[in-house]
Amino acid sequence: MAASLSLKDVNLHFGGVKVLQDVSFDVEPGVILGLVGPNGAGKTSLFNCISGHYKPSSGSITITGKEVRGSAPSRLARLGLARTFQHPALQLNATVLQNVLLGGHIRLPGGPVSWALRLPYTGRAERAIRAEALELLDHAGLGWAAELPADELSHGLHKGIELWRALLSKPALLLLDEPAAGLSHGEVQQLIATVKRIRAEQDITIIIVEHHMGLISALTDQVVVLDHGRKLMAGTAAEAQSDPRVIEAYIGKDSADDAA
């Protein structure tokens, strides 16, 4: 079941530096939300707060009604959160299939520890998850690469491996951190088609941090724009791109005045 997400007055301070200030917004189940803003706006820091890599200084973060501020990533994974990173975190010496299978360990009886100890009751579940992983790779057109070392594949395919690994955990909430970074135009179009298919086939909520506004326009139901750690506006991608405050944040007040 797709998750809801609610942030209320989230603040993040590192010493005297205010990275996030009073950020609040809600994401309904099944929505694709884009989190956008200029460099240094606080987008990845906010992702890190949601995914348990940073503990906010104050405020509330709830997933489907459960307070999760400051929770460990392992607890968030059990609640159905999965995340990709701007720079894929893969085991390059492992095969593509082995990398994808890492996403399924959270679903094993007893979790990753039982899998590592090779306890008997994990065998059936492990075989089922392996079959799912192979099906995901076939569906993505990557079945041919399942037994290849990950380091033999391109950056674009590394991005795909990380996405399929996240999906194998059966997430209710999926966070995609700059999924189009470093991709060619053709790879971006393929990514858009993939995310649309994921949405059509799975009951899932997706939040995307991205600078590629073509992708944001093609995929999102709504966007939240951050600037200097604050929420600047919320609305549709089209509304954001025509909002004078957003234009000023991206290109500067003088340039925005000249454009007007």
What are these regions (language model features)?
Residues 2-260:
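Glycine-rich phosphate-binding loops of nucleotide-dependent enzymes
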